């Protein structure tokens, strides 16, 4: 996430904005698709630092991690843009902040997906929560939730026995603008397909799919968002 304040006299009359689309969640046991960064440029189709007013991160958003019988890592946080990544970072006040990592899936020995606390990384967005894990005994577990804080509500995880994770939401009210990621899907241990992870809202991460004989698909990552205001 990047925030900038630039005197208008230092900017051209026309800017070109490319907003990154969220990466797709993968099917069972597969890795998701990485989401590209967002750019503000002084020339169309140019992303080199000498053309850029702003760039959202040092690298494209990491793809969601593929689940296995033993691993359950969450997706990595969005990277911090560097001062040299865009010449426009030196035109005014500039702050870059890392995103929030996704929650881990439930353990291979069985367990609920890891919940994500909204606002826990100091940004008004969130990673996606982890999907539930199921053991060889086929016990079902719920997906992780997005735990609300302040004015932001809790988004519950998918119920045990193949419940789908809930989609992330966007709040736009005075005095709050915020989004969150999707919650995790519940497991389907003995048969069937586990719950799908919830899709994310702007700038946030998709929820992890639940584990099972056939794991649930991961949720889609949120699209980027560029807001430009002048006064």
Task: Please give the residue ranges for each predicted region.
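Intrinsically disordered, low-complexity regions enriched in glycine and serine
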Residues: 129-131, 183, 206-211
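Secretome/extracellular-domain signature
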Residues: 1-152
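C-terminal, surface-exposed recognition/capping segments
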Residues: 191-219
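A C-terminal functional module that forms or caps the active site or interfaces directly
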Residues: 127, 180-190
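Short, structured beta-strand segments at or near domain termini in extracellular proteins/domains
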Residues: 220-231
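Composition-driven low-complexity repeats that form or flank extended alpha-helical/coiled-coil segments
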Residues: 154-157
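Membrane-topology and secretion signals of cell-surface/extracellular proteins
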Residues: 164-166, 186-195
């Amino acid at each position: 996430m990047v925030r900038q304040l630039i005197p208008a006299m230092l900017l051209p009359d026309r800017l070109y904005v490319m907003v990154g689309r969220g990466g797709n969640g993968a099917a069972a046991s597969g890795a998701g698709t990485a989401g590209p960064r967002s750019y503000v440029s002084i020339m169309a189709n140019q992303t080199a630092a000498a053309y850029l007013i702003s760039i959202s991160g040092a690298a494209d958003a990491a793809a969601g991690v593929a689940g296995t019988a033993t691993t359950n890592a969450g997706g990595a946080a969005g990277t911090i843009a560097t001062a040299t990544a865009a010449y426009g970072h030196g035109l005014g006040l500039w702050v870059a902040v890392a995103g929030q990592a996704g929650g881990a899936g439930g353990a291979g020995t069985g367990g609920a997906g890891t919940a994500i606390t909204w606002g826990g990384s100091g940004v008004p967005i969130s990673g996606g929560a982890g999907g539930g894990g199921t053991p060889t005994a086929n016990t079902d577990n719920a997906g992780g939730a997005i735990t609300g804080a302040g004015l932001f509500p809790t988004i519950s995880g998918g119920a045990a026995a193949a419940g789908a994770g809930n989609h992330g939401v966007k709040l736009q009210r005075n005095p709050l603008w915020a989004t969150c990621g999707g919650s995790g899907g519940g497991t389907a241990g003995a048969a069937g397909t586990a719950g799908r992870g919830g899709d994310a809202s702007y700038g946030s991460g998709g929820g992890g799919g639940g584990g099972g004989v056939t794991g649930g698909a991961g949720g889609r990552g949120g699209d980027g968002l560029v807001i430009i205001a002048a006064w």
